Amino acid sequence: MTTTAAGLRRTFTHDHVVTAPPDALFPLLCPVLEYAWIPTWECTLVHSVSGVAEHGCVFTTDFGDGEETWVCTTYRPPTAIEYTRVATGGWVTMLALALAPTEAGTALTVAQTFTAVTPQGECAVAAMDETVERDVWTDLSRLASVYLATGAMGPA
């Protein structure tokens, strides 16, 4: 077995609220449907039998820090969806989204585990900012709430 100096792992977990029930929110957690409510969303769908998110769905993104290949590894409507993302920059992200009903709508728990697989990835993972990651998901929760309330995309 060969080992590497990489392997740094960091996990960030945040709780958010979306003002709609889980069965309304869950379908939006999809690479195709995110175009309707996330102003900056872009992806290339590689594989999906249904044309939307499903177990085994594969797509790619590139938001300026290198391409990532996403695979949907858990698909349990309307309570859980997980994606594993492999970044060309040398890290893997496990993204787990858990949805639970509340009086306000949906409690959304976002858990992101970043694991470096190269020395370059180790630098990237070490530099990741938990506050930035939380703020991204706070904004996404706001955008989902706006879309589900109005049917229109909110401002970025």
Short names for language-model regions:
Residues 19-23, 73-78, 98-107:
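A short, structured loop/turn motif at beta-sheet edges
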Residues 33, 45-90, 145-155:
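Glycine-rich portal/gate segments that line the openings of hydrophobic small-molecule binding cavities
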Residues 1-50:
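Hydrophobic ligand-binding cavity/cleft-lining segments
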Residues 4-6, 50-51, 72-73, 98-100:
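Short secondary-structure boundary/capping segments
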Residues 87-138, 154-155:
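Beta-strand/loop substructures that line and gate deep hydrophobic ligand-binding cavities in soluble
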Residues 9-17, 58, 67, 80, ...:
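Intrinsic-disorder/low-complexity, polar/charged segments enriched in Ser/Thr/Lys/Arg/Asp/Glu/Gln
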Residues 1-17, 137, 141, 145, ...:
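Hydrophobic-ligand-binding modules of eukaryotic lipid transfer/binding families
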